[in-house]
Regions:
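Two-component/phosphorelay signaling modules centered on CheY-like receiver
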Residues: 13-32
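Acidic, metal-coordinating helix/loop segments flanking the phosphotransfer/catalytic sites
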Residues: 33-51
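His-Asp phosphorelay/catalytic-motif detector in bacterial-type signaling
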Residues: 48-50, 75-80
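Receiver (REC) domain active-site loop signature in two-component systems and cognate sites
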Residues: 58-61
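C-terminal output helix
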Residues: 109-118
Length: 125
């Protein structure tokens, strides 16, 4: 997966590092970190990413708002978005998928599960 770039959006520095590490070390991708949805949107608006991984509950802008902005149009509207959250309720998953999330994973999540989801969405297998 060399030369592919992911945007990891989560307000937890530890989770951002864990996801970025998995993408970099296990999947061979570059990863940029963003601390909340607003930071993620700024970085997405000025960079090129093949996939976005986002939490839901974050300050300033939550992950669902970010998914909605991505899907509203523009150059990134077709970028796969993986929601990775502690929100395991079916109505939360349904909201995310209705807004346009490509996949929904519930924390705690294993690095291999994240990598497999990314590979599937990017059709790299």
């Amino acid at each position: 997966m060399a030369h592919l770039h992911a945007l990891v959006v989560d307000d937890s520095p530890a989770m951002r590092k864990q996801l970025a590490y998995a993408l970099q070390r296990v999947a061979g991708m570059d990863a940029t970190e963003a601390e909340d949805g607003a930071d993620g949107w700024r970085k997405l608006s000025t960079g090129t990413y093949e996939i976005v991984l986002t939490d839901i509950n974050m300050p300033l802008m939550d992950g669902l708002k970010l998914v909605g902005l991505i899907r509203a149009g523009g150059p990134h509207q077709r970028v796969p978005v993986v929601v990775i959250t502690t929100e395991g309720a079916e109505n939360d998953r349904r909201r995310a998928m209705t807004l346009g999330a490509s996949a929904y994973l519930v924390k705690p999540v294993q690095a291999q599960q994240v990598v497999e989801t990314v590979r599937t969405l990017l059709r790299l297998d």
